[in-house]
């Protein structure tokens, strides 16, 4: 299933006490994701440190083109994403093996939805 990768995470207390900061972080993430989905190869290369290219700009750009489709254009957590992440975590974190976790309580798309509207 879909595997969440670049995410913002914190304690719910921080979100409750700092909604404006939380929204600003979500705005930045969604804005960056939208840019990444539209950026051309030359735009990408201009922003990436030379050391990331590992001496092969063409290979880096080819790899980028292959991974681009996996980038979320709106920053929303896919419905099946948390379950996929939990299954993966349980494979190497023994303390989670027998835990029942209400995944709906572990994330919110509210901030990403507002950011998506802002940058639509």
Regions found by a protein language model. Give the residues of each.
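Secondary-structure end/capping motifs
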Residues: 16-97
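Periplasmic-binding protein-like
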Residues: 1-18, 26, 66-67, 104-115
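Conserved C-terminal helix/tail region of periplasmic/extracytoplasmic solute-binding proteins
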Residues: 86-120
């Amino acid at each position: 299933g879909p595997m969440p990768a670049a995410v913002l995470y914190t304690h719910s207390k921080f979100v409750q006490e700092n909604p404006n900061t939380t929204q600003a972080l979500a705005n930045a993430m969604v804005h960056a994701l939208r840019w990444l989905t539209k950026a051309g190869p030359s735009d990408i290369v201009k922003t990436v440190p030379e050391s990331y290219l590992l001496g092969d700009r063409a290979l880096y750009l080819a790899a980028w083109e292959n991974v681009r489709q996996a980038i979320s254009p709106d920053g929303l957590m896919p419905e099946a994403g948390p379950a996929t992440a939990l299954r993966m975590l349980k494979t190497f974190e023994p303390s989670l093996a027998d835990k029942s976790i209400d995944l709906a309580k572990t994330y919110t798309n509210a901030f990403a939805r507002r950011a998506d509207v802002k940058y639509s």
